[in-house]
Swiss-Prot record:
Top-level taxonomic group: Eukaryota
Modified residues (N6,N6,N6-trimethyllysine): 14
Record field: transmembrane: none
EC number: 4.1.1.39
Protein name: Ribulose bisphosphate carboxylase large chain
Subunit annotation: Heterohexadecamer of 8 large chains and 8 small chains.
Originating species: Mercurialis annua (Annual mercury)
Chain's gene name: rbcL
Role summary: RuBisCO catalyzes two reactions: the carboxylation of D-ribulose 1,5-bisphosphate, the primary event in carbon dioxide fixation, as well as the oxidative fragmentation of the pentose substrate in the photorespiration process. Both reactions occur simultaneously and in competition at the same active site.
């Protein structure tokens, strides 16, 4: 019989959903010559804020 080990939930990552607004904009990002600009038209479903639909 193998020994049991204790697993801690706080190790690795914290479960949950972050507000999208907190993760999609990075003001300190500097563009590179290899960056590609792409544009898409997205229509949010009813009840979804436009900034989260993209």
């Amino acid at each position: 019989m193998s020994p049991q080990t204790e697993t801690k939930a706080s190790v690795g990552f914290k479960a949950g959903v972050k507000d999208y607004k907190l993760t999609y904009y990075t003001p300190e990002y500097e563009t590179k010559d290899t960056d590609i600009l792409a544009a898409f038209r997205v229509t949010p479903q009813p009840g979804v804020p436009p900034e989260e639909a993209g």
